[in-house]
Curated annotation (Swiss-Prot):
Assembly, per entry: Homooligomer. Both monomeric and oligomeric forms interact with RNA. Interacts with protein M. Interacts with NSP3; this interaction serves to tether the genome to the newly translated replicase-transcriptase complex at a very early stage of infection.
Keywords assigned by UniProt, alphabetized: ADP-ribosylation, Host Golgi apparatus, Phosphoprotein, Ribonucleoprotein, RNA-binding, Transcription, Transcription regulation, Viral nucleoprotein, Virion
Pfam families the UniProt entry points to: CoV_nucleocap
UniProt region (RNA-binding), positions on chain: 33-159
PROSITE patterns assigned to the protein according to its UniProt record, in alphabetical order: COV_N_CTD (PS51929), COV_N_NTD (PS51928)
Bias (Basic residues): 17-26
Family the UniProt entry places it in: Belongs to the alphacoronavirus nucleocapsid protein family.
Annotated gene: N
Modified residues (Phosphoserine): 9, 156, 254, 256
Protein name stated in the entry: Nucleoprotein
Composition skew (Basic and acidic residues), residue ranges: 201-235
Gene Ontology annotations for the cellular component aspect, listed alphabetically: host cell endoplasmic reticulum-Golgi intermediate compartment; host cell Golgi apparatus; ribonucleoprotein complex; viral nucleocapsid
GO MF term list: RNA binding
Entry comment on modification after translation: ADP-ribosylated. The ADP-ribosylation is retained in the virion during infection. Phosphorylated on serine and threonine residues.
């Protein structure tokens, strides 16, 4: 095999399944960690007979590195001194990594099954193995997984950790309650002793408490601080929208002031989505240093114009809310639509009433009809 590696081609591969050699693999306690969760094999099945030859997990490495091997983990449990075998686990490692990092592709090793994607390079990868502090990844494949294979998940470790944390938290809460009850008893006795000492000194604690409550009540009854923006003596471009209608500061919506629907204009910064909309507006420094500015005389004033372009993320929900406010004044509101619909329905009902044939000209037919037969009489006599 060339030192630079060759492309994998399964075209000349025999259809006969790969078997095991008699050489022994390394013991489990020496095995580096795989990037992926293991495959558990049903008892009685043989992994090397069932494993597709391109059974390489997705998501790691480039197309040249989709090559490696599945390494067997033999498992058992001791029950009353007797060994009870458990289903085998198989872990995937990339070529040049793991317990058989020095092995060549297709080298016969006990408990090893080689796999590769068509066109992968038969030279060692540099992908390494998983660190001890990292979680293993879920297995995903672009080929059919044999029904005898069970792709394991990390539930057992998470559940074990959760149960351990729950037990620890329960013990902590119980200890905390015990300490708190003990501390409360001590605090009560200390408080009583202090009150008795103050009373002997002539200090009336009840009157002091009443005065404190009275001051607190006075503060609560005092007027709340007015947070309404002071806009009277400010230029239009320095005014701040408060709660309520903003047209008195910025005028009605038009082609030159085209932002805001009826709710936003009527309620100002108390509108439902105002905080989200404000997050989509550039900062002062962004406008100052990231805009194109022009100025010209306009009578006794200077007219200043700036153009600012920026981008909002398309998949952000706030962006959708922001875009709905642009030119909203030119679109009919939902309230106006509903009013027009009600008005149209009312007019339609009036027309129907006007078109009803007078009772004197209709045939008085009182037969009872079933659900499938209806006779309509629409004959008017002169």
């Amino acid at each position: 095999m060339a030192s630079q590696g060759q492309r994998v081609s399964w075209g000349d591969e025999s259809t006969k399944r790969r078997g095991r050699s008699n050489s022994r693999g390394r013991k489990n306690n020496d095995i580096p960690l795989s990037f992926f969760n293991p495959v558990t094999l049903k008892q009685g099945s043989k992994f090397w007979d069932l494993c597709p030859r391109d059974f390489v997990p997705l998501k790691i490495g480039n197309k040249d590195q989709q090559i490696g091997y599945w390494n067997r983990q033999i498992r058992y449990r001791m029950v009353k001194g007797q060994r009870k075998d458990l289903p085998e686990r198989w872990f995937f490692y990339y070529l040049g990594t793991g317990p058989h990092a020095d092995a060549k592709f297709k080298q016969k090793l006990d408990g090893v099954v080689w796999v590769a994607k068509e066109g992968a390079m038969t030279k060692p990868t540099t992908l390494g193995t998983r660190g001890t502090n990292n979680e293993s990844k879920a297995l995903k494949f672009d080929v059919k997984v044999p029904s005898e294979f069970q792709l394991e998940v990390n539930q057992s470790r998470d559940n074990s950790r959760s149960r351990s944390q729950s037990r620890s938290q329960s013990r902590t809460r119980a200890q905390s309650r015990g300490r708190q009850q003990s501390n409360n008893k001590k605090d009560d006795s200390v408080e009583q002793a202090v009150l008795a000492a103050l009373k002997k000194l002539g200090v009336d604690t009840e009157k002091q408490q009443q005065r404190a409550r009275s001051k607190s009540k006075e503060r609560s009854n005092s007027k709340t601080r007015d947070t309404t923006p002071k806009n009277e003596n400010k230029h239009t471009w320095k005014r701040t929208a408060g709660k309520g209608d903003v047209t008195k500061f910025y005028g009605a919506r038009s082609s030159s002031a085209n932002f805001g629907d009826s709710d936003l204009v009527a309620n100002g910064n108390s509108a439902k989505h105002y905080p989200q909309l404000a997050e989509c507006v550039p900062s002062v420094s962004s406008i100052l240093f990231g805009s194109h500015w022009t100025a010209k005389e306009d009578g006794d004033q200077i007219e200043v114009t700036f153009t600012h372009k920026y981008h909002l993320p398309k998949d952000d929900p706030k962006t959708g809310q922001f875009l709905q406010q642009i030119n909203a004044y030119a679109r009919p509101s939902e309230v106006a639509k509903e009013q027009r619909l009600r008005k149209a329905r009312s007019k339609s009902a009036e027309r129907v009433e006007q078109e009803v044939v007078p009772d004197a000209l209709t045939e008085n037919y009182t037969d009872v009809f079933d659900d499938t037969q209806v006779e309509i009489i629409d004959e008017v006599t002169n």
